[in-house]
Each structure stands twice: as structure tokens, then as C-alpha cells.
Amino acid sequence: MKQILSILLFGASSIAMAQPMAEMQPELDHPITEPTATEMTLETPKESKMQSLGQQALQDIKENTKFGGYVIGQAVFNDNDASKVQSNFNLRLIRLYVDGKVLDFQYKLQLQANGFGNDSKGNSPRVVDAWIEWQKFEFAKIRFGQFKRAFTFENPMNPWDIGANGYAQLTSKLAGMSDRVGEHSSNGRDMGVQLQGDFLPIGKDQHNLFHYQFGVYNGQGINKSDQNGHKDYIGGFFVRPIKELQLAVFGWSGDYVANGITVDRKRLAYGLKYDGKINVRAEYARSHGRKIGTDANGLPAAVGANRADAWYAIVGVPVGEHWKFWGKYDVYRDNKEWNSTKSLYNLTAEYYFYKNLKIQGTYSYTHDRTAVDKDYNTFDLQVYYRF
């Protein structure tokens, strides 16, 4: 009985003590509640912007990424008595590419699929383009990777658009296609970084009066690292008085290294390009620097003349909806003297079945003062298809 009374008295005293303490607790204006899921995931403005850019990038990839390619098949016949093969069928080009634009960046990856494995001259399947370009501002775009050298009008042009059965000798020998210095086949490309832009819009159409491009390159062609720490500097400056006409001058200062031999590659080119109802293109280029070859003992050496030059002119005229005809005069001088001249006179006819399929026939008369058979004729038939 005493134990029960003790327990009751202790409980009553505890309640009495707790009541004043409860009254001392200040009342809260708002009750404490658990945070909601939305409040727990609230983002900062920076995080929100990054998420928005990420979503936009994904959308750009879906909408702007393009896969494609083209094939050029060729049949060639000639009457050159010094040639071991006077007729030949081959795949001139097979190209596969992916390109697109994400946010302010344009990109391209292009592979050349035809050729021969482990070809020492670079004519094997290979990466030809792998670049990305920041295009935030029209007057200053920065490109990085492997891409066309900024030299001559014709070099950056697609084989579909040059208007003949092949690039001019000027482009081939002096712009890095199959360069005279002995560089492996590089399709006019090198690895580096380039700044280019357009500015000063004029006229009713507001076309830009000026365009510039300047690049720093390894100087060794595609898929090759720098060999001596000296870079090639290549640039061009364009004036466009009317939308259809461009006038330009190009410069190249660099060198090339192979087998422990270094030769200069200092070049200047200038020309014009008109794209209207007809197409006209003409360029001249000169080069200072020897070639890399072998001496009388078969050892690597700088050989050949220290200078060369080349020029060409081409005109294209459409006839009706499907036909286009071209005429081209094409000259290369390996030592800048007439005794080293190789001249080509071309007539070309193209028939477009539709925009992605055409057949092209070219007749060429060649006068080569350095060859055994100095004068010969060539007929070239090519089929172009792209997808």
C-alpha cells in the first residue's frame, strides 16, 4: 500500500513540474515540417543553365547530325606510248563521313575507304578529316584538328564541284595533294589550328566584303606528327566586291622533313573565282624549295630545282537542266622554266541524272616536255554517286 501511494505522489509531482516548462516554450509562427522533394532538388542558376545547355546539345545532335558519303568510279584510256598501262578501271574515291553542329560548334569526321593497305605513299584507307570549329562569331571562327590547308581556291573544294576529272596540277603539286616535295598523299590537308572569318557586309544582299583565314600546321601532312618543331603558317585574304566574285591572295611559309632531310616550302598564290550563271576560276602559284629524293648513291637528299610554278583557268557553262560543259587550261613547271612544262587541255561534259548522281566524260590533250612521249591523248569516264 505504501509503495502504491509513493508511485502516485511521484507521478503527480512530475506533471506539476512539466506544466510550467511547457508554458515557457515560445510558440512557433510556422510548424516545423519535413522538406518536400521539390525543395530538396532545388538547383542553383548555374546548375539550371548547364542542364539547359545539355538538353539543347542532345537536341542538336538528334536534329543536326548527318551521315553520308560518295563514290567516284573511273575508267581511263590513253595512247601514251611510254605508259605500261593504256587502259584502267579503278575506284577514284570512296568517302564516308559524319558531320553536324552542336550549340556553337560544328564538327566533321571523314574517312577515305579506297586504297591499298600499308601503302608507303599514303594511298591506303585513312582518316582525312577530323575537326571541330567554334562558330560563335561570324568574324572569328576557330577550327582545330585535321582539315584542308588554307591555300588556293581549289584546294578546299569538294571533288564534285571542281568541274573536271581531277584537281589542277597547281593544287596537286603545290597545295599538298601529292606535293612536289615528296610528302605522302595528304588530300590537301594537315593537322593544326585555323582562325577564319567574314566581315563588313555590303550591298543589297549584305554579302561580306572581306574574308580571311590563317592556320598553323605541323607541316607533315595528314596523320603525321611534327618532325622538327617548326610549324607551317598558311593564310589567305579574300575580297568579294559582288556576291558572285572573289579575288584572293594566299601565302605559305614552312618546311618539310623526311629521312633526316629538310626542304623549304615557301609559296605564294593568287586568283579569282566567279560563281554565277557560269563558273570561272583561275589561279597562279609559285614555290620556293627543293624536293626530297635520292642522290646518285641512292641516299636521301634534297634534289631538283629550288623553284616551281603553276597556273590554270577553267570555265563551266550549264546547258539545259541536266548538262554542264567545262573547258580547262592547266600548266605546271617543275623548275619554273619552259623546258619542264607539262600542259593539259581539257574538255569535259557532265550529265546529271539528279543532284546526287552524274556521269562525266573528259578528253585531255597532254604536252609534257619532260616525258618520253611528249604528246598524247586521254579519255576519262567517271560516275559520281553520293548518299
Please identify what each model-predicted range represents.
Residues 238-335:
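Detector for outer-membrane/organellar transmembrane beta-barrel domains
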Residues 316-367:
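C-terminal hydrophobic structural anchor segments
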Residues 74-81, 112-118, 151, 202, ...:
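Sequence/structural signature of outer-membrane beta-barrel proteins
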Residues 5, 17-72, 387:
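N-terminal periplasmic/intermembrane-space "pro-region" immediately following the signal or transit peptide
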Residues 54-219, 227-234, 238-247, 314-317, ...:
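Outer membrane beta-barrel
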Residues 351, 375-387:
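Outer-membrane beta-barrel "beta-signal"
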Residues 10-17:
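Hydrophobic h-region of N-terminal signal peptides that target proteins for export
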